Amino acid sequence: MTTETLTQLEQHELFIRRHIGPDSAQQQEMLNFVGAESLEDLTQQIVPESIRLNRDLAVGSACGEAEGMAYIREIADKNKVFKSYIGMGYYGTEVPSVIQRNVLENPGWYTAYTPYQPEIAQGRLEAILNFQQVSMDLTGLDLASASLLDEATAAAEAMALAKRVSKAKKANIFFVADDVFPQTLDVVKTRAECFGFEIVVGPASEAVNYELFGALFQYTNRFGEITDFTELFTELKAKKAVVSVAADIMSLVMLKSPGSMGADVVFGSAQRFGVPMGLGGPHAAFFVTRDAHKRSLPGRIIGVSQDTRGNRALRMAMQTREQHIRREKANSNICTAQVLLANMASFYAVYHGPQGLKIIAERIHRLTDILASGLTAKGVELVNGTWFDTLSLKATDSEAITARAVAAGINLRIDSDGVLGVSLAETTLREDIAELFDVILGEGHGLDVAALDAEIIKAGSSSIPAQLVRTDAILTHPTFNSYHSETEMMRYIKRLENKDLALNHSMISLGSCTMKLNAATEMMPISWPEFGNMHPFCPLDQSEGYTDLIEELSTWLVDITGYDAMCMQANSGASGEYAGLLAIRNYHISRGDAHRNVCLIPQSAHGTNPASAQMAGMKIVVTACDKAGNVDMEDLKAKAAEVAENLSCIMITYPSTHGVYEETVSEICEVIHQHGGQVYLDGANMNAQVGLTTPGSIGADVSHLNLHKTFAIPHGGGGPGMGPIGVKAHLAPFVAGHVVVKHGRESDNNGAVSAAPYGSASILPITWMYIKLLGHQGLRQSTQVALLNANYVMKKLSEHYPVLYTGRNERVAHECIIDLRPLKESSGVTEMDIAKRLNDYGFHAPTMSFPVAGTLMIEPTESESKVELDRFIEAMISIRGEASRVESGEWPADNNPLHNAPHTLADIMDPEFDSRPYSREVAVFPTAAVKLNKFWPTVNRIDDVFGDRNLFCACVPMSEYE
């Protein structure tokens, strides 16, 4: 019989062992190799003593998975899921089970990274290309992005694009129609203030009265009205204004496209295509423009190119527009977007096809017609005379109606002046219409849904003006007309998944990306209706579960970061940067220091840093780094003194982007504070801080957290993400607010940075579960093992590749950089060759050429076992051996396994392969481990230059697949 106690047998800390890859024996073996006695000893060797956290985090102790699920079930049950007719950009939708099970709940889709390595990402690239095709077909425009964060931020991007491309160069006014969604206007105003644009709000028809660089209209508008903008757009374009339209994706199935009216930009939320409301997100926004503006399009674009065999292949196009290359000159700061949700929406369109979508849209519209017919027959006056799915009612007894609605478990939209709104959705049934009659009219109305339907059919009239009915065909590509049975759809999704390498196959060691385990238990609650079916603008007493979860999570994150308050609104890390910089900006303005607009940024910073600073209206001054990769203190002091009068802040990353804990970090903060500035600490590398130190104790004033890195939200192939910001008390009054939802906080009336008050709220349960399950013990140990894994990999590889930077005691933090420049000089083998060759070994490449060109940055995370680390190390050593054969002249520089990587099945089946100076086995089975678990790239190396010179960003003809 065991002598263990009951507490030990209950295994409350079991999840820690599930999350952390190396077991205790493996950890000790690795510690012995790197020269440390224990994790604590290693921590003391690496983390500067002056910043170490000498207490347990106040997040509670670890708990078991079943226990954690019980806790979050109690929280979820506090949410009251009413039938929502609020609309305003958020609607009930049916998530097809085949998509929920095979995409949303499938680690093959949700654990992949942004497709920077396209040869091993052809599946999700095709799904995103489908999303772009849906966007282009429905909007009637030429070129779509791969997704933006939400509809409101897409509106702000449309405004920025309009300013870039408008030929009305002297104009500084952006017009916004007064019937757009209020949250959209709120976000646009926030962005415009930083850019110095003047926002004019008024009736759409008045736009022609101003000298504009751009204008924004809603189609259909917030009250449900459908407007033909053709003449207005013609007038505006004659005045050189760029016209943008916020459009409802479901209505576009039936309505004339904005592009055919003359719109230059069309955007909106794809939420209605099979993505739950989730208290506001995550949802993909579509963004489409004309070909003439392609260089100004924000975000990723998926394009068609060819590989070295001349076969069709997909990849991210025109990356020179983006923040990781153009930095402060980029079109936007977008990095993480909403790819997983865009993929769900694209699969929704594929599954239903054009006819299925038309039936869904027509059913929604018919139910709206029936509701309107019944209400008007009983004397109810409608504000709008046309509609797709939304009615606005002039109600003389709105309080009584609202009371009946609440009693029936129904939420209506309450506008000013006694106007009530009703927006129907895919989830609305005929029984719901009968219930709405009871709520709005009271009992005894005598209306019958079937009879009203028959009358509408007999009358043959329409609430959609004839000239606004869509007449052109949509989604004609075979992809949208082939997979309508569940069997075919399941297999199509699986075929695409098989082309992609995600965490369910092997380690993804991307530096500064933290590709850790996204545990199944953490993921499960996001599929629950108690979290998924909540409207972001529902009454607060209905979302008590969400409120409790967010407040507790905020309390935990405050303690983890050492800050005083959290703002949970930003939808990505880059969005969090922008939100944090806005807090700094508004803090200075409140003190009469509006002139403080200079942001110091080290040359090693992430590309989003200068891009975000530019968006916040700041001027960037770059500071140098020394030979060790640290911030050059003398240069920093000189530049801080030089711009002292106008210094707003500095943006630093900790540990640094060079993968070390800089000893001078607190001194950096002191220098900035001495000159009246604030310190923004980028949270991208927070996985090396949790439980060991805090940004607040270091001396920072504000940080964003990448919940999709440090706190286990999956990357989803390029999103979703969350970037909440932590702030010191003096900045708390200046964080983002929201125009619709008020919480009685000092920041309520501040401008918003996202459409919803809590951003992508429905993925916050993942982070809540992560912290709850690990507890203070697991969080600290996770960070320590992340350090151990990185130092183990670094020391193993240092015998074969030079390590670019180390910190105190020749250690690195949670990531290391290997320098490939000497190898390139001696052999001609490039970092690109090594990255593509790793695909043949079954690995995604580490981060290439950041922060230093010609390097690889490796971040293994705590979730990878010693077995997996050794497999990666073996691959890297084997590749170095292959490079040696090129160095020696045994293999030609232009015909060797690295230069020709990656290799496909077609390669080894090709009889001409025999002419190569290496064998088929060397090409595709270079180690014994690869033979046991082979991943096959489906295309050869892709020609990016060809793709950008021959830009094509739509679904290709089916003949290309043959």
UniProtKB/Swiss-Prot annotation:
GO terms for molecular function: glycine binding; glycine dehydrogenase (decarboxylating) activity; pyridoxal phosphate binding. It comes from the Bacteria. The modification N6-(pyridoxal phosphate)lysine is found at residue 709. Pfam families: GcvP2_C, GDC-P. InterPro entries: GcvP (IPR003437), GDC-P_C (IPR049316), GDC-P_N (IPR049315), GDC_P (IPR020581), PyrdxlP-dep_Trfase (IPR015424), PyrdxlP-dep_Trfase_major (IPR015421), PyrdxlP-dep_Trfase_small (IPR015422). Keywords: Oxidoreductase, Pyridoxal phosphate. Its cofactor is pyridoxal 5'-phosphate. GO terms for cellular component: cytosol; glycine cleavage complex. One of its GO terms (biological process) is glycine decarboxylation via glycine cleavage system. It catalyses: N(6)-[(R)-lipoyl]-L-lysyl-[glycine-cleavage complex H protein] + glycine + H(+) = N(6)-[(R)-S(8)-aminomethyldihydrolipoyl]-L-lysyl-[glycine-cleavage complex H protein] + CO2. Gene3D superfamilies: Aspartate Aminotransferase, domain 1, Type I PLP-dependent aspartate aminotransferase-like (Major domain). Its EC number is 1.4.4.2. The keyword Phosphoprotein does not apply. SUPFAM superfamilies: PLP-dependent transferases. The glycine cleavage system is composed of four proteins: P, T, L and H. Belongs to the GcvP family. NCBIfam families: gcvP, PRK04366.1. HAMAP family: GcvP. The glycine cleavage system catalyzes the degradation of glycine. The P protein binds the alpha-amino group of glycine through its pyridoxal phosphate cofactor; CO(2) is released and the remaining methylamine moiety is then transferred to the lipoamide cofactor of the H protein. This is Glycine dehydrogenase (decarboxylating). The gene is gcvP.
